[in-house]
């Protein structure tokens, strides 16, 4: 496949949506319709329906493995219907969360095991990993304070988990960053948004010299 695949990861409150919006705008200005933005869970009609079930606060009784399997099922549809066709067409994909989120949230946060969630998702991704993953990292307490202050009206089922849950999520992300240093670039998200965006631009340019050339 001739395209390029960049995923964006991070614990809740890391500012991922704001950063990704700025990066997306800059790359669309440079590359136009060669840029494909997508997200997980979601990215196509079937996967978006699964997303609605997963994030609905009314589904608090959902079993942890049911949750993990639903994320994997949504991801499989995303890979087959959205990601692989875009890569085969030579597009640049910007993906808001991917496999690492399942490993962090279900493997770490839910304590189902990093390796077990990795193995489960091999059926979903069919060998497809990002070329580059931007991991926005910050202290758990800072992230949760941002959520409470900035987007209380859009808090979802996973946002409502305990502080210890979110600590386990962050630790799983840090473990992944150590395990896959050639793919995952950690960016300090505990700084001014403009600085975070600039650091992300620099990380992308370091991997792809033709992007963010000005």
From Swiss-Prot:
Enzymatic reactions: dTMP + ATP = dTDP + ADP
This protein's UniProt keywords: ATP-binding, Kinase, Nucleotide biosynthesis, Nucleotide-binding, Transferase
Binding, ATP: 10-17
Entry EC no(s): 2.7.4.9
Listed InterPro entries: P-loop_NTPase, Thymidylate_kin-like_dom, Thymidylate_kin_CS, Thymidylate_kinase
Pfam families linked to this entry: Thymidylate_kin
GO annotation (BP), single: dUDP biosynthetic process
Chain coiled-coil ranges: none
Keyword Glycosyltransferase in record: no
Lineage top rank: taxon: Bacteria
Top-rank EC class of the record's enzyme: transferase
Any Gene Ontology CC annotation: cytosol
Role this protein plays: Phosphorylation of dTMP to form dTDP in both de novo and salvage pathways of dTTP synthesis.
Protein family according to the UniProt entry: Belongs to the thymidylate kinase family.
Name of the molecule in the record: Thymidylate kinase
Lineage: Bacteria, Bacillati, Bacillota, Bacilli, Lactobacillales
């Amino acid at each position: 496949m001739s395209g390029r695949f960049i995923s964006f990861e991070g614990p809740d409150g890391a500012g991922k949506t704001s950063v990704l919006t700025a990066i997306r705008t800059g790359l669309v200005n440079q590359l136009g319709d060669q840029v494909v933005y997508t997200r997980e869970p979601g990215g196509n009609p079937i996967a978006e329906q699964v997303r609605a079930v997963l994030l609905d606060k009314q589904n608090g009784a959902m079993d942890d493995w049911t949750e993990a399997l639903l994320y994997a099922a949504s991801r499989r549809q995303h890979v087959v219907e959205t990601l692989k066709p875009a890569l085969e067409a030579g597009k640049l994909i910007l993906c808001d969360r991917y496999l690492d989120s399942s490993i962090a949230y279900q493997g770490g946060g839910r304590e189902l095991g990093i390796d077990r969630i990795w193995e489960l998702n091999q059926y979903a991704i069919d060998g497809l990993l990002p070329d580059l993953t931007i991991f926005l990292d910050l202290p758990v307490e800072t992230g949760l304070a941002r959520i409470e202050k900035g987007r209380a009206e859009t808090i979802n089922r996973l946002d409502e988990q305990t502080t210890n849950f979110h600590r386990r999520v962050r630790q799983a992300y840090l473990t992944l960053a150590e395990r896959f240093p050639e793919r995952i670039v950690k960016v300090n998200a505990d700084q001014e948004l403009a600085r975070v965006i600039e650091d992300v631009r620099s990380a992308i340019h370091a991997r792809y010299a033709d992007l963010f050339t000005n």
